[in-house]
UniProtKB/Swiss-Prot annotation:
Its cofactor is Mg(2+). ATP binds at K18, D47, N48, E49, D67, D90, G138, H139, S140. InterPro entries: PurM-like_C_dom, PurM-like_C_sf, PurM-like_N, PurM-like_N_sf, SelD_I, SPS/SelD. SUPFAM superfamilies: PurM C-terminal domain-like, PurM N-terminal domain-like. GO terms for biological process: selenocysteine biosynthetic process. It comes from Nitratidesulfovibrio vulgaris (strain ATCC 29579 / DSM 644 / CCUG 34227 / NCIMB 8303 / VKM B-1760 / Hildenborough). CDD domains: SelD. It comes from the Bacteria. Mg(2+) binds at D50, D90, D227. NCBIfam families: PRK00943.1 (NF002098), selD (TIGR00476). It holds the Pfam family AIRS. The record marks K18 as: Important for catalytic activity. This is Selenide, water dikinase. Binds 1 Mg(2+) ion per monomer.
Amino acid sequence: MTVDRLTSRSRAAGUAAKIAPGDLERILATLPRDPREGERVVVGTRDNEDAAIVRVPGGKAIVQTLDFFTPIVDDPYLFGQIAAANALSDVYAMGGEPWCALNIVCFPVKELPEDILADILRGGADKVREAGAVLVGGHSIEDESIKYGLSVTGIIDPDCYATNTGLRPGDVLLLTKPLGSGVLATAVKAGWDGFEAHEQELGRWGAMLNRAGGRVIRELGLAAATDVTGFGLGGHLLEMANASNMSVHVDVSTLPLMPAVLDLVATGLLPAGSHANRHFCSGNVSVHPEVDSLLVDIVFDAQTSGGLILAVPPHLVDDACSILRAEDAPFWRIGHVEEMGEGVPRLVLQP
């Protein structure tokens, strides 16, 4: 049997397949709120949080999330790892620890060999095990388009967690993975020259757990954090700025980029989701005239299994860096938070 490349079987790859933020916002605005939320829900859907935090008996809480997507790479085992790491990331972004997970699978079992699906599931299971969680089952349907991910339950202190609403003036912003996965995934899907190297780079970063960042949140009691996924760095920073009523300033020259990303963007290679992100955010963003427009595109590039944005009070920056170094986790200082004043943009991109 001739097997197509996995990335050729879907319209969009990874988190770039998300519904555009403007469309999603309109749809969700029509849904009523459950009046019981106040009894159980510590953190819900109001501020576009990464996951929900729900009280359970005994004064404890769980953190709940779900994430799945189409292939971002052609290697099935690597795809499983990346998809699982991406789903687990939401728990880490809140300051929780993954506890158990369920598989979510869509697969054309009558068209592709079963061992491809087995490799996807094996990649996911290995990543769940690395996170210290337990895989306890799942659900599958037959579908023309391959999709895989996890529903993850984590444990969390109901009095110590990070959200989009916790930004404070002076907070320093740390980013724990480089940008550009949306661009590289588009190159892989298109079979661009050198796409095999791009796939390796996607695997290197996409399969990396955000566990070290979660440890920083817990040990230092950070109030604000998120992970960078389908709405891009700019989109997720803007969510935090809006939820916290703050202004976020990004030093674009400090942003870490995956290899070849800038060159690929210069050729016009950018996923449709990235264009949608930039358009949706444009009314709340100020771009300094000296900032390269290609870098602005990358700021809004739709990421898959991206790093955490950690908002760290100035007096805790050294401690945060020490924890990340002890975990051998990469990080970059990319900006800071300021008070929101009249005429001040929510998101400022400066050289």
